[in-house]
Each structure stands twice: as structure tokens, then as C-alpha cells.
Amino acid sequence: ADARPMKIALTIAGSDSGGGAGIQADLKTFQQFGVFGTTVIVALTAQNTVGVRAVEAVPESMVNAQLTALAEDLPPAALKTGMLAEAALVRTVARAIRQNGWGPLVVDPVMVSTSGSRLLTTEAEEVVREDLLPLAALVTPNLDEAAILTGRVVHDAATMERAGASLLRFGAGAALVKGGHLADGEITDVLVTPDGVRRFTRPRIETTPQSISASTWPVSPMIKVLSETIRPLTRPSTRRTSRKRN
């Protein structure tokens, strides 16, 4: 048997009662890639395949307690953020990432629901841009989120490239602008890095958000490029070794 310890990946996001997004989807993905998933839950959502019925933010003190517990005993080798609910929670999360030297960080800036509703206040959107993006090795907005973060109209591959370049100027190491909302028969994702631009195009597949295997099978070339992109962008860790407990 392989005696090597599993690497730890942390997801900081909201809980989705429907299991198709948020913490639940992240943990399924982590398991697919053979890493041990840990969580910091920042919001509770009551939702299903039809829509979101309610959202409630977790108190800042509880979010901070979760972050502290993981820093003491289960520090991540990599982490991602999803919906962070409120400006204060974004600041709390960004502060913990800086203080613990955690990385590489993937920021999925969940700001707009599938029905088009804004999920964050304007203040929270600004804090994501100012506090979280400079910590990110990779930011992965969809078209709506890229438009919010950059203040640009994003509607095709060319504007996706320009938005990605703007996100790098805000401090992100790389930007993957996801074009799943484009109204045509193909999906085009645009990866912008300091070395240039790559486009990934694949046929649109009608599937549910819960169909993880269906949604991930076409992206293996992208995963290879992303891993090669993120590796040199990883910031040196300033994590201190935690004391052993008796």
C-alpha cells in the first residue's frame, strides 16, 4: 500500500443543500483527484435544482475559528475560495491566508446566481478585488463575474481576453475566464497568464450541475496547462510548523 500521506486541499465556501455546488461539489472533486478535503463553511444555503430558497452567512467568529483550527493541525497544500457572502468574511479569509502563508490559492469569485441575481454586496465585490485577487495564483470568473470585477462588458472571446488581462493587473497570477454562458454551440474558456493567452474550446453538453464526471471529462488538456501555470506562481510558504500536542 502507498504509505505517503494524502495532500490536503481546503475549500472555503458556502454549503449547498442540493449537493451540486459549493462545499459539497468541491469535496467530490477533491476526492476525484485523490486529495484529502477540508472545509471552512462561510454560508448556509437552502437550494435545490430549481433555485435558491435562502442564504445565511456564518458568523465571522465561527469562520475565524474554523480557519484557526485548520492552521493549527491541518494546513492545506492548496486551497480555493467560493462564495464568501459578506465583505467582513472576505477580509477574514484573506487575512488568514496571508498570515498562514497558504497557497497556491484558486479564487472562484461566486457573485451571481444562475438566475442572474447578485449574491454579494458592492462592498464585498470590492473587497474580493482588492484583498483576495492579489493572493490568487488563479482566478476563475464566469462572464458575469469577470464583468463585475473589471467593470468591462464581457461577451465574447476577445473581451474575455481583455478582462483576463485586467485581472492580472489587479494582482492575480493567472485568470481563467469561463465562457459557459456564451450563446452559441461551443464553450470557450480563456486562460490569461503573464506568458500569454490560451483558448480552450469544446462542444456544449446539456447536463445538470450535479454531473461532475460529465462536466470535467473535456478539460484534461486545460488541467495540464493550469497545473503548469500555477506551479511557478506559487508563493513561498511562510507557514510556521505547529507544535506537537501532548
Residue locations for each model-derived region?
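Low-acidity, Ser/Thr- and Arg-rich intrinsically disordered low-complexity segments
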Residues: 211-220, 227, 231, 235-245
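Conserved phosphate/ATP/ADP-binding segment of small-molecule kinases
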Residues: 122-196
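Glycine-rich beta-alpha junction loops
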Residues: 44-45, 85, 111-113, 145, ...
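Conserved N-terminal subdomain of the carbohydrate kinase-like
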Residues: 3-11, 23, 27-119
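Intrinsically disordered, low-complexity polyampholyte segments enriched for Lys and acidic residues
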Residues: 2, 26, 130, 161, ...
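Nucleotide and nucleotide-moiety/phosphate-recognizing core
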Residues: 87-102, 162, 173, 191, ...
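Short pre-catalytic strand/loop immediately N-terminal to key active-site residues, enriched for Gly-Thr
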Residues: 12-18, 198-211
